[in-house]
Amino acid sequence: MGYFRCARAGSFGRRRKMEPSTAARAWALFWLLLPLLGAVCASGPRTLVLLDNLNVRETHSLFFRSLKDRGFELTFKTADDPSLSLIKYGEFLYDNLIIFSPSVEDFGGNINVETISAFIDGGGSVLVAASSDIGDPLRELGSECGIEFDEEKTAVIDHHNYDISDLGQHTLIVADTENLLKAPTIVGKSSLNPILFRGVGMVADPDNPLVLDILTGSSTSYSFFPDKPITQYPHAVGKNTLLIAGLQARNNARVIFSGSLDFFSDSFFNSAVQKAAPGSQRYSQTGNYELAVALSRWVFKEEGVLRVGPVSHHRVGETAPPNAYTVTDLVEYSIVIQQLSNGKWVPFDGDDIQLEFVRIDPFVRTFLKKKGGKYSVQFKLPDVYGVFQFKVDYNRLGYTHLYSSTQVSVRPLQHTQYERFIPSAYPYYASAFSMMLGLFIFSIVFLHMKEKEKSD
């Protein structure tokens, strides 16, 4: 106690001022750390790029430059780098993962198929580009996501839709834009030139409803060894041949698989394209760049991201929600839905958003109408009491799953709220009153009627 008393007396009795040299050092340290703090706050999405070799950074520079121009912070490493790590102390070190290393046989460091799957389960975005020299890790990762790659050294072959510069194996495919998924949020809104593709084919797991067939082969395409005669049924044939596939998991994590690493290359971006068939139109440039940018915007959640804003509900004519609604109340429900556009949240424009009023099953299902930046609707509560939910469950192709649920209680009418006379019971009322009236008349007649006396 004596030491504590002396310490307090010393601290309160004499207040020492900070020496000028100490204050100067503190201010100097603050100004030195300020730019670093600003840089950390302003950094874009952290993206790890795994390459077979660092030369890929030069051969695919246009694609990487498009990411940097949009603010992405790219970290380039070879796929077998022993220092690789996605997770540290239970936290993800990166927001996105790009795998441009199709021939990798073993990832370096702490990265493997299990950690990549955990990264996806945690909401991370992954872009994978394969080739005919595909290794087992990418094949296993595809299986985890409902995608099955063909064997190593196979390629997609199309004897009717190959480019004029093909070397004779008909593996340089010209994919028509009609084979693209009809989802502008994923593939872009602008019309594209034909797509140039050279790589391995894929097929989707028919039992996985989350797989998206982004770009398919034509009806004449198939996947096989280009330098061997066909002795067995090919792994993928016709429209079932996937060139680019996608996946949006139930936690809104997104993954894209491309069977062609060349699809993202500068040479394919800048190449002219023309089918070898006589009379085919020649295009000065492929549509690869525009499609690659659109796919990257979607997979890295720059497009198609929705969120729920303020939600309100109340009786019509009031402004605040009650503690409990009463059956057959006329209520108004409104919700704000926003969409991420160019890094900013803007009102979402949709005409197919539905509201459900659910107990166990929906009792009311109605469309929400846009009004003044929010979606609202008025409806009458059912004549059923219990615990209900205002539920908006919006799940559309290319958009993140939007879900909002608000629980409310609906009670029956109070004793004083019931009608005195129910119209459907009027016949019974008439029967009761007529019987009362009849009894009254009978009583009067019976009491006042005097029998005649018998004469002797």
UniProtKB/Swiss-Prot annotation:
Q: Where are the transmembrane segments?
A: 428-447
Q: How does it sit in the membrane?
A: Single-pass type I membrane protein
Q: Name one GO molecular function term.
A: enzyme activator activity
State a single Pfam family of this protein: OST48_N
Q: Which UniProt keywords apply?
A: Congenital disorder of glycosylation, Disease variant, Endoplasmic reticulum, Membrane, Signal, Transmembrane, Transmembrane helix
Q: Which GO terms describe its cellular component?
A: azurophil granule membrane; endoplasmic reticulum; endoplasmic reticulum membrane; intracellular membrane-bounded organelle; membrane; oligosaccharyltransferase complex; oligosaccharyltransferase complex A; oligosaccharyltransferase complex B
A GO biological process this protein is involved in? Answer: protein glycosylation
Q: Which residues lie on this side of the membrane: Cytoplasmic?
A: 448-456
Q: Which InterPro entries match?
A: DDOST_48_kDa_subunit, OST48_MD, OST48_N
Q: In which pathway does it act?
A: Protein modification; protein glycosylation
Q: Respond yes or no to whether keyword tRNA processing is given for this record.
A: no
Q: Does this entry carry the keyword Thylakoid?
A: no
Signal peptide range equals 1-42
Stated role:
Subunit of the oligosaccharyl transferase (OST) complex that catalyzes the initial transfer of a defined glycan (Glc(3)Man(9)GlcNAc(2) in eukaryotes) from the lipid carrier dolichol-pyrophosphate to an asparagine residue within an Asn-X-Ser/Thr consensus motif in nascent polypeptide chains, the first step in protein N-glycosylation. N-glycosylation occurs cotranslationally and the complex associates with the Sec61 complex at the channel-forming translocon complex that mediates protein translocation across the endoplasmic reticulum (ER). All subunits are required for a maximal enzyme activity.
Q: Which family does it belong to?
A: Belongs to the DDOST 48 kDa subunit family.
What disorder does this protein's entry note? Congenital disorder of glycosylation 1R: A form of congenital disorder of glycosylation, a multisystem disorder caused by a defect in glycoprotein biosynthesis and characterized by under-glycosylated serum glycoproteins. Congenital disorders of glycosylation result in a wide variety of clinical features, such as defects in the nervous system development, psychomotor retardation, dysmorphic features, hypotonia, coagulation disorders, and immunodeficiency.
Spell out the subunit comment.
Component of the oligosaccharyltransferase (OST) complex. OST exists in two different complex forms which contain common core subunits RPN1, RPN2, OST48, OST4, DAD1 and TMEM258, either STT3A or STT3B as catalytic subunits, and form-specific accessory subunits. STT3A complex assembly occurs through the formation of 3 subcomplexes. Subcomplex 1 contains RPN1 and TMEM258, subcomplex 2 contains the STT3A-specific subunits STT3A, DC2/OSTC, and KCP2 as well as the core subunit OST4, and subcomplex 3 contains RPN2, DAD1, and OST48.
Q: What's the protein name?
A: Dolichyl-diphosphooligosaccharide--protein glycosyltransferase 48 kDa subunit
Upper lineage: Eukaryota, Metazoa, Chordata, Craniata, Vertebrata
